[in-house]
């Protein structure tokens, strides 16, 4: 049975991809990061997300594979991506088909704004 977790920027499936189709699996998780290309992803930042995903999956080993547990992993990854954005390790894709700034408005450093807003 195919289980999934879907957030704005993270999709997790209990499936393998074969010939562009999801094939349900009880032993494989497939991660799709930022399917709408809302962000510009430096390779290093994307690899950080993959490593965080691996760590979250490992920390849940031995737990039942349920939609609830997948949603927890997805929510934790979503928070991790927000943290990367706030640290400036990735940025919004201004050529994205939708500009909704789902993780907050972009912030630019400017001498006049030093200390004028909370991080």
Curated annotation (Swiss-Prot):
UniProt KW NAD keyword: yes
EC no.?
7.1.1.-
Q: Mainly resides where?
A: membrane
Membrane-protein topology: Peripheral membrane protein
Q: Where in the cell is it found?
A: Cellular thylakoid membrane
For molecular function, the Gene Ontology terms on record are: oxidoreductase activity, acting on NAD(P)H, quinone or similar compound as acceptor; quinone binding
What are the entry keywords?
Membrane, NAD, NADP, Plastoquinone, Quinone, Thylakoid, Translocase, Transport
| Record GO cellular component, one term | plasma membrane-derived thylakoid membrane
Role: NDH-1 shuttles electrons from an unknown electron donor, via FMN and iron-sulfur (Fe-S) centers, to quinones in the respiratory and/or the photosynthetic chain. The immediate electron acceptor for the enzyme in this species is believed to be plastoquinone. Couples the redox reaction to proton translocation, and thus conserves the redox energy in a proton gradient. Cyanobacterial NDH-1 also plays a role in inorganic carbon-concentration.
Q: Which family does it belong to?
A: Belongs to the complex I NdhM subunit family.
**Protein name as annotated:** NAD(P)H-quinone oxidoreductase subunit M
- The gene for this chain is ndhM
């Amino acid at each position: 049975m195919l289980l999934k977790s879907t957030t704005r920027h993270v999709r997790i499936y209990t499936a393998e991809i074969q010939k562009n189709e999801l094939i349900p699996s009880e032993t494989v998780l497939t991660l799709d990061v930022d399917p709408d290309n809302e962000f510009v992803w430096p390779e290093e930042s994307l690899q950080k997300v993959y490593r965080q995903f691996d760590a979250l999956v490992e920390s849940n080993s031995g737990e039942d594979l349920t939609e609830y547990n997948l949603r927890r992993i997805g929510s934790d990854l979503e928070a991790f991506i927000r943290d990367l954005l706030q640290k400036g390790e990735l940025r919004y894709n201004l050529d994205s088909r939708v500009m909704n700034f789902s993780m907050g408005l972009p912030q630019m450093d400017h001498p006049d704004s030093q200390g004028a807003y909370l991080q």
